[in-house]
Amino acid sequence: MKMTKDQKTCRKLWLEHVRESGGIVHTRPPIGDENGFCLVAMPCAYNSRHAKFYDVSFAWCADNDVFDRKVGEFIALDRQMFGQTTKLPGYIIDNMLEMDLVD
């Protein structure tokens, strides 16, 4: 999938918005048999790093797809911005950070 100029611009703006809001964007390329993914987590309380809950969106890479970091980020950010999220407790995100699963 090639990104259009509009998609590239949206990705940059959304990425900046997520980071300024205390959110997390993490992309992991495929490793061995595991698929690659992009995770976007936004605290439900604005700019609160230790929020009790996060709105989380994912973009997964299928086995036969080539995973492109920027495309994965765009898909996950698009889902985040348009409300296609799930809520996760903050301790799960904190545990992932401690285990070095996300940046």
Where are these regions (language model features)?
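Catalytic phosphate/metal-binding cores of nucleic-acid and nucleotide-processing enzymes, i.e., regions
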Residues: 1-103
